[in-house]
Amino acid sequence: MNAPAKFSTSQIRSDFLAFFEGRGHTIVPSAPLVPGNDPTLLFTNSGMVQFKDVFLGAEKRSYVRAADVQRCLRAGGKHNDLDSVGYTARHHTFFEMLGNWSFGDYFKKDAIAWAWELLTQIWKLPTDRLLVTVYHTDEEAFALWRDMIGIPESRIVRIGDNKGAPYASDNFWQMADTGPCGPCTEIFFDHGDHIAGGPPGSPDEDGDRFIEIWNLVFMQFDRQPDGTLVPLPAPCVDTGMGLERLAAILQHVHTNYEIDLFQALIGKASALTGITDLENKSLRVIADHIRACSFLIVDGVLPSNEGRGYVLRRIIRRALRHGWMLGVRQPFFSKMVPTLVELMGEAYPELVVAKDTVARALLAEEERFAETLDAGMKIFDEVASRSQDIIPGADAFRLYDTYGFPVDLTADIARERGMRVDMEGFECAMERQRETARAAGKFGGGVALPADLVASMSPTVFLGYEAYDADALRVVALLKQGRPVERAQAGDEVIVFTDRTPFYAESGGQVGDSGQLNGPGVLIEVADTQKFAGQFHGHVGRISEGTLALGDVLAGGIDVQRRGKTILNHSATHLLHAALREVLGTHVQQKGSLVAPDRLRFDFSHFQPITADELAVIERKVNAEVRTNHGVEVHNMAMQEALDFGAMALFGEKYGENVRVLKMGGYSTELCGGTHVTRTGDIGLFKITSEGGVSSGVRRIEAVTGQGALDYVADEERRLLEAAHLLGGNATEVVDKVRALTERQKRLQRELESLKAKLASGATADLGAAAIDVAGVKVVAVRLEGFDAKALRDAMDRLKQQLGDSVIVLAGASGGKVALVSGVNGSPTGKVKAGELLSNIASQIGGKGGGRPDLAQGGGEDGPALATALDGVPLWVKQHLG
């Protein structure tokens, strides 16, 4: 079969969506690779992920028929194809899944009929090359294929429970141990008897002859805890068809890497690496990985050392290592992005929008890994040369910890050489590091509530959104020295739990409130408020008067001024987050924060330092929102309603069914349980005080607001005026005067270097004349006042040219310290080693040094011992010359 030219990969996407749109389906955009509704899932790995809540009955959509092309990733967690990518015909990290869905609307008859129509009438697949499977008890599906479609029974394969349990089958799908489930029917394409492999269900089914094209899942049961199946009132259809596999069939090629999309990417990789063999496995890896990496960055993931960011880093570094194998030593991977945009930008406009961000992020990671890749490969070669067939876990960990080699990258390299990694040893080394980190992170005073106490308490009712003080607060628990007690007295350090409180407990980056609790004859100074077991507010403080007992009723009031300063900073972090995403890109995600009375600290994902111009724009945008004086709206709503409302949720955070949404005009909408201003104008002024890196892929901004910002600006102005005074001008002249001063300093430095060179030249002439002859070798060992290491090396070079066969030791003394340089030139090089000579001298003056046989340097302390050490050089040389 010669496939018509119209069946390009992009045309297949369009055909699929147009076909189902014409049959009443709503076309739904692809969900991001980062699931927004399932914290248990690392990446979107199938088409049904974005519809999971619909199938579970937790969400309703405005349509009952849908079709989409979903981008998917399988490179981490349970579903991980990374190790196979590049080495097999059909494994990918990133792939596209074509799917059509029915939510209680059509069922088996229409799903089967439409699938067959699209494959055989639109895409013209020969019917005698197709066969299907059904679950062994699904008589309805079997009959539809035989009677409605007309497939001979010989090409309808019944698949039973082949995974060791009832309903555990390749042809029975279930979301979990309980809940929606049902049989599925799969459509296979026969590549022909020239390809090894048997039909599904046969002993040879894993061969490449019969390839699954389309899986139609019929969710018609609700599985109960006891394993019984109860029919669903509204059965659903969930289908999935891999675009790359289908394209291979429609383009009459056997492997996915031969389709038009991959051939274009492989061609670009070939041009960048100079490798002309288009079947080279490394080119395939690079072509596959550029899709996964680019779309992860599009969806807000950046390279880091944890979670999704680390999966991205692993994929990037695997691609870079394959480039290194091909001899590439310069950045190349980021140069693949324009070709990818040409190929997939029409289908995914978000890729076009983010293309510059993607390229910059990849380039930054290329430059970072290039610093250690060569060194790491040398270490691997050394380890491999002394190992038989196993790379020790400790060495794999060293490659990971010191050289940035993800362990699966090390395993990849080992596999290519017929070796494997001792994963147990690697995990032991990792666990030792985790234990060290945990020990370093512990601090005194950490308290955990006993389980029985937690069970007896109700969550604390927080009153602090509306009130700064409250009464009738009943003491429900009391801790002293970390243990529950019934009473405590004046002088005791305690943690007091009340049924209600106006005190905010530290969470979401916002520090806890301080203040006072008081009752008849008792006063507690509250220094901090912490959240215990995620739901109990513990007032941490000291009883300054009286005795406190369980059941006592107290009044409490927070430090209003401290809270007031804190809320300015908290609201400012929301505006800052929005401004960062507007200026730097939507890849920016919050990674941590501190909201205190005196400052705010905001950590976020970004792959490079922020320029001064970018910082200025960010600060200006935040202050513009402050001046606009938006009202701050608070809404309590269901999680899905909040997301539909436009609220931004933080990746990795766990949210309940109902959430609190904070909206500042049209600029910022986030989920937040903290305390905030009522209008953005209350913030007054926002001023960034610093920006820097925290870890790989994470930046940090610190800032101040309100009176703190005014004080900061006033202090900066004072320092500017002081600098102007010292420079003899006014504030507007500081930059010009500093520039002139810097140029003068550079000129004087050049003049000084010139004078030093002349001094060294004169000293060299004198030293050459004073050289001592030791067995035909000229020996010089002298002290030179004021010479630094560079001047000593210059003098050394001149002396070597002047003296020929020689051994030279020069000591430059300045400020109580000595710089040492030793050199060996000509015939004595084999017997006298400069490094050994310098080490001998340095050890006598309390220093150290070393180097090559012909040149070494070091240092030590100035003093009488230096003269003695230098005087002994001729004898040392004589002894070594023999």
Swiss-Prot record:
CDD domains: AlaRS_core (cd00673). The keyword Transcription regulation does not apply. Its EC number is 6.1.1.7. Keywords: Aminoacyl-tRNA synthetase, ATP-binding, Cytoplasm, Ligase, Metal-binding, Nucleotide-binding, Protein biosynthesis, RNA-binding, tRNA-binding, Zinc. GO terms for molecular function: alanine-tRNA ligase activity; aminoacyl-tRNA deacylase activity; ATP binding; tRNA binding; zinc ion binding. Its cofactor is Zn(2+). It catalyses: tRNA(Ala) + L-alanine + ATP = L-alanyl-tRNA(Ala) + AMP + diphosphate. GO terms for biological process: alanyl-tRNA aminoacylation; negative regulation of DNA-templated transcription. Binds 1 zinc ion per subunit. SMART domains: tRNA_SAD. GO terms for cellular component: cytosol. It is found in: Cytoplasm. The keyword tRNA-binding applies. Zn(2+) binds at residues 570, 574, 672, 676. Belongs to the class-II aminoacyl-tRNA synthetase family. Consists of three domains; the N-terminal catalytic domain, the editing domain and the C-terminal C-Ala domain. The editing domain removes incorrectly charged amino acids, while the C-Ala domain, along with tRNA(Ala), serves as a bridge to cooperatively bring together the editing and aminoacylation centers thus stimulating deacylation of misacylated tRNAs. Catalyzes the attachment of alanine to tRNA(Ala) in a two-step reaction: alanine is first activated by ATP to form Ala-AMP and then transferred to the acceptor end of tRNA(Ala). Also edits incorrectly charged Ser-tRNA(Ala) and Gly-tRNA(Ala) via its editing domain. This is Alanine--tRNA ligase. It comes from Xanthomonas oryzae pv. oryzae (strain KACC10331 / KXO85).
